[in-house]
């Protein structure tokens, strides 16, 4: 789950992380009053969308007068902001963050993530801040330092020394860095984040460390522990089909391919996607209906898959353990009749009540292609489209 920059900074502030003063605007009302509350000389007007590259796209601008603030908010609010992460269609800006300006002396990079290699939360830091970290990793990887944190000890003095050294924090900056590293780690772990990125982390001319930007992703599987964070979801930034799937308890992720997938079990779903690619097609989605799906839930899953206009065929791959194949078959037929499936449909069933499930499909008189195994199913769906 992603949130906006201003929401991320509000959370970090609760963990005593230094962030610039700022206020959010949800409309063009009260612009001057909001600006006066934030600063009295320099402001930064920031578009709030779930995408990077806002500055290069014209969504982050500096104002040096209240009149400039008003004009910039009027310009940015409602604009279709195009960045390297939005695609050519861009995203409409419906929220604008007004923040006090900072006198920047140096820009650094810092992030925390769950590192699969070390099986720990790791800091990724670099003296090359304010730029695309992927470019730094490709061109000058020696400028990036990774420090993995032992969950049994948390951030130790040795970790702080390593991080401070990597970022060249000396003198008065080192104790500030020490507090910052511990606060960011606490925020990451206690909030069940999957990514926390500060780019740039700046040193001001006054020799203060400030998080000038903040990107936060939460582990969606842990949101039941944080109902207050669920309220931060901006529906306008979410995929409509993914929101609908979530409401029905389905795990759905939209992809860019042409073969819709309906599978039970995350591992089987990923294997299905791999074999579809092996045969030269591309999966249009990841969709796991789980082990206790009902006929009604399978019908809703079909509706969600077919809401994607790029879908040219559907592959159903079910291994019936907890889920019965006859229930899936009834759901497939119900969905095919209700939503008028007009694309090729290949079904592979195996497991509990498989013969009954196959019989239900055969007697339905629908144009459903049966498959004996996953390889056969993937081959048939790619040939059918």
Outline where the language-model segments fall.
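ATP-dependent carboxylate/acyl-activation modules
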Residues: 1-197, 202-316, 328, 337, ...
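Short internal beta-strands
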Residues: 342-351
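Glycine-rich, proline-tolerant flexible connector loops at the mouths of alpha/beta enzymes
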Residues: 319-323
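Shared catalytic-loop signature of beta/alpha-barrel
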Residues: 326-330, 343
């Amino acid at each position: 789950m992603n949130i906006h920059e201003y929401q991320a900074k509000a959370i970090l502030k609760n963990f005593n992380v230094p962030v610039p003063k700022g206020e959010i605007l949800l409309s063009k009302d009260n612009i001057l009053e909001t600006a006066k509350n934030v600063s009295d000389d320099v402001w930064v007007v920031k578009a709030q969308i779930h995408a990077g590259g806002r500055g290069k796209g014209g969504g982050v601008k500096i104002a040096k007068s209240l009149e400039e603030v008003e004009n910039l908010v009027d310009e940015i609010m409602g604009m279709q902001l195009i960045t390297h992460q939005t695609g050519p269609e861009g995203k409409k800006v419906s929220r604008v963050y007004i923040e006090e300006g900072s006198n920047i002396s140096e820009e650094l990079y810092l992030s925390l993530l769950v590192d699969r290699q070390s099986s720990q939360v790791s800091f990724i830091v670099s003296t090359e801040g304010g730029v695309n970290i992927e470019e730094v990793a490709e061109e000058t990887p020696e400028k990036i330092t990774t420090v993995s944190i032992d969950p049994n000890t948390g951030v130790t003095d040795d970790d702080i020394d390593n991080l401070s050294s990597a970022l060249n924090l000396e003198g008065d900056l080192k104790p500030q860095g020490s507090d910052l590293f511990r606060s960011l780690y606490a925020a990451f772990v206690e909030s069940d984040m999957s990514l926390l990125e500060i780019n740039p982390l700046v040193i001001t001319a006054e020799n203060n460390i400030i998080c000038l930007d903040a990107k936060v992703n939460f582990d969606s599987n842990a949101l039941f522990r944080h109902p207050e964070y669920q309220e931060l979801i901006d529906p306008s930034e979410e995929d409509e089909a993914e929101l609908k799937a979530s409401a029905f308890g389905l795990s759905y992720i939209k992809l860019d391919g042409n073969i819709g997938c309906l599978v039970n079990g995350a591992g089987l779903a990923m294997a299905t996607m791999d074999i579809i690619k092996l045969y030269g097609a591309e999966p249009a989605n990841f969709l796991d209906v789980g082990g206790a799906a009902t006929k009604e839930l399978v019908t809703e899953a079909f509706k969600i898959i077919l809401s994607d206009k790029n879908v040219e065929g559907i592959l159903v791959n079910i291994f019936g353990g907890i889920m019965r194949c006859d229930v899936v078959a009834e759901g497939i037929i119900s969905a095919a009749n209700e939503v008028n499936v007009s694309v090729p449909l290949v079904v592979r069933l195996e497991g509990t009540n498989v013969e009954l499930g196959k019989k239900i499909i055969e007697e339905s008189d629908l144009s459903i292609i049966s498959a004996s195994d996953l390889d056969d199913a993937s081959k048939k769906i790619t040939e059918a489209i």
